[in-house]
């Protein structure tokens, strides 16, 4: 499911799409998918694509930040998808926080 979400984001022109395997490092999820967008509209459009693309597999337990569009978080339990505007991604630095996690870059 992480790979599918990452590919949806990449096909939707997100930049710097990565999958972090955080299993064993945290209890909140097994995988993070992180992607950057240039503006809020693009972020909401990509969130919609992920929600639609994964709807046949699973519905998210929770979605946060959709209205603001600066950091959209889609929580699928074992997978958390983060769609950041570039500035917010740099500020929060999830890749730095989870630097020990195995990483796969998409694209």
Question: What name fits each language-model region?
Answer:
Residues 46-51:
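Short amphipathic alpha-helices in soluble, non-transmembrane regions
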Residues 1-24, 38-45, 57, 64-71, ...:
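Long, contiguous binding/interaction regions
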Residues 27:
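P-loop NTPase catalytic core of nucleic-acid-dependent motor ATPases
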């Amino acid at each position: 499911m992480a790979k599918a979400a990452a590919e949806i984001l990449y096909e939707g022109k997100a930049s710097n799409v990565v999958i972090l395997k955080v299993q064993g490092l945290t209890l909140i999820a097994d995988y993070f998918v992180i992607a950057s967008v240039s503006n809020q509209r693009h972020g909401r459009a990509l969130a919609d694509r992920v929600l639609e693309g994964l709807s046949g597999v699973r519905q998210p337990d929770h979605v946060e930040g959709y209205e603001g569009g600066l950091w959209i978080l889609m929580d699928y339990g074992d997978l958390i998808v983060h769609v950041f505007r570039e500035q917010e991604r740099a500020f929060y630095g999830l890749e730095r926080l989870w630097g020990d996690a195995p990483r796969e870059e998409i694209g």
